[in-house]
Amino acid sequence: MISGFFLRITVAVLLATPLCPATDAHSVGCPTRRAPGAVIPFELIGDHIYVSAKVNGSGPYRFIVDTGGVNLVDSSLVKPLSLQITGQETGHGVGAETVESGKTTIDRLDLGNHTFTSEKFYTFDLDQLYPGGGVKMMGMVGAPLFARYATCIDFSRHEIELINPADLDRQPAGTVLPMSTKESVITIHASFDGVPGVFQVDTGSPTTLTLNTPFVTKHDLLSRFPRHVESSSGGVGGSVREYTVRGKNLVLGSLSIVNPITALAVASKGNFARADLAGNIGNGALKRYVVTFDLPGHRLYLQPYEPAPPNLDTYNRSGLRIDVEPTGFRVVSVAKGTPAAEAGIRVGDLIVTVNGKPSTSISLPEIRDELRERPAGSVFTMGVRTDDKTREVQLTLRELL
């Protein structure tokens, strides 16, 4: 979510991994009365949605899709694309720091088979949003781009369909939830473990659920979960400490997500410190459904996949959070009492080999997937470099939640 001038995107809760629902789950689809019009293919990487975009005829560039955010273009494209900057804004993110962003207009933006014209964008250094994430993104498309449409996201087909509101077939569209939009923030009423609240729906977040600090404090949620993993998430404005737990249920209208992986934020400033929101529902939850944002009609539709996608809400079994660098995987955090900590891996270490393979031959999504999806008891042999010395360690996965 990068909302209004609140610029944020969650990097990860430890290791967010790519997970594509089963491609044969096609008993549901985008609810339109007519043949598909504007169709935008996308990639799902690390539970982020990426589309291929052409800007003023140049590209293609990889843009992330955040229906709860504003439109952004990377600052590095301003000069080569001759974009005119007309003003500056100050934004806030998950942390306490402020960031600067410029204003510009993109005359032509091509996504899939659809062309947008004269769209307002902000310029921003997008490396701050997803540092070392293994995917170089050059822009973001958000709520202003989709405000005129019912926007359907089909995670199974990896397609976004822009539907004329008059052509939206509401009968088979699924469970309907009233939806509000303010400063590009899309919200619904939901409940976590029986506690109701107003939650943001955020396709810019790869996580299942993050609960804001005031909500956590008010309902004394930390004391309810003695079993947790302490970690951090980062983005614009710095990083935020959080406790990751497994809740009982997240209720969305008539639908329920059982045992959702949930981050309890510990923040004094930034988006996660907002008292007007209970929390943030991300793609880890949304990928269970065909999701239709009817912004003109102020409704959110959720159609569950049949059968349900596999491996939902499996959690990182290593305790590692890593980013990618040219020579390997840099250790960003090590959760206390986890296999990574017990193996002697430390923050700042560089993982140069994994099971005998150079880390440079393995993509970041692949290693994240391995560390989460391999069963408990699986052993990884890693070459770990501290300063100028390399040692071999054994990391044995186990269930942490």
State each model region's role.
Residues 19-401:
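Pepsin/retropepsin-fold aspartyl endopeptidases
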Residues 1-5:
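N-terminal secretory signal peptides that target proteins for export/translocation
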Residues 8-18:
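Bacterial N-terminal signal peptides
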